[in-house]
Regions:
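Residue-identity detector for threonine
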Residues: 6, 10, 82, 89, ...
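Charged/polar, solvent-exposed surface patches and flexible loops
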Residues: 19, 64-71, 85, 89-96, ...
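Short, charge-rich amphipathic segments
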Residues: 1, 14-28, 41-52, 93-107, ...
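Active-site/acyl-donor-binding loops of N-acyltransferases
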Residues: 34-55, 182-267
């Protein structure tokens, strides 16, 4: 269970953590802190607070790709029935590209049905003619936004739909609506090559990569299992089942708890 908003950096109390783990079904609670001598940076928080955001502030590649999307695609807010009717291809092909096996109709319907029930959740879509070739899912509360997910079809990637969606979201919320913060989440705890590509993409479209310390607190019943032997076993299973997201996440949590390894993105 990750604290929301993700970008909150104040330390929670011990009582708060105890109550969350006791009353939820979560095996682990996670939150962010400012790095210090006791909490070294081990993750990146992707965040934009620039209320003067514009294309001219981006790199040459960032401007080029956002403009390409603007010429090729129609980008707008989309309602949930539209996502459910037209978004499966973008979702499924994205999950396959990142090596995950859950790009199924059942997972798509379950995920976005549940997500759509919260009135603070919405979506932005990119259309190419009558095809929804990409969409972003958002959490919008008070004066902040978190990008929860981003999905695009394989045959649309030359049009840079994700760049166009990011530009739309930053322009709409920071400039038009004068929000304070747009967050694009955290670097992954999973040992995956895609992490480097995502890091470069998020910086290209206008987000700062803020070094943070990501802390994990295991449920008391699981703490005896956080040991080097279990970590070694988790790494072996990850090699045998590289598409198993749960095992990859568990391995990442154990690495952070036992080795406190700074993320390679810090270098």
């Amino acid at each position: 269970m990750m604290r929301v908003p993700t970008f909150a950096l104040t330390p929670p109390s011990g009582d708060e953590l105890h109550d969350i783990l006791r009353h939820s079904r979560s095996a682990v609670a996670s939150y962010l802190l400012e790095p210090d001598e006791s909490h070294q940076a081990n993750a990146c928080l992707y965040i934009c607070n620039n209320r003067s955001y514009c294309l001219e502030n981006l790199s040459v590649a960032g401007r080029r790709d956002a403009r390409r999307a603007g010429r090729s695609l129609r980008i707008e807010f989309v309602d949930w029935p539209t996502v459910m009717a037209h978004g499966f291809t973008a979702f499924s092909e994205t999950r396959t590209r990142v090596g995950l096996p859950d790009g199924t109709v059942e997972q798509f319907q379950s995920r976005f049905h549940q997500f759509s029930l919260n009135p603070f959740h919405c979506a932005v879509g990119a259309w190419q003619d009558d095809s929804l070739v990409a969409f972003m899912t958002l959490v919008v509360v008070d004066d902040w936004v978190e990008i929860e997910g981003s999905f695009s079809a394989d045959n649309s990637r030359t049009s840079c739909p994700n760049d166009g969606l990011a530009h739309f979201v930053l322009s709409h919320f920071l400039i038009k609506r004068r929000f304070n913060t747009v967050s694009y989440g955290l670097s992954s705890i999973q040992d995956a090559q895609q992490t480097i590509g995502l890091h470069s993409y998020k910086k290209k479209v206008g987000f700062d990569a803020k070094p943070v310390h990501r802390a994990f607190v295991l449920h008391p019943l699981l703490r005896p299992f956080a040991n080097p032997l279990i970590l070694r076993g988790a790494r072996m299973v990850t090699k045998m089942l590289p598409q198993n997201r749960m095992i990859k996440k568990a391995s990442g949590v154990l690495v952070t708890l036992l080795e406190n390894s700074p993320t390679s993105l810090m270098s």
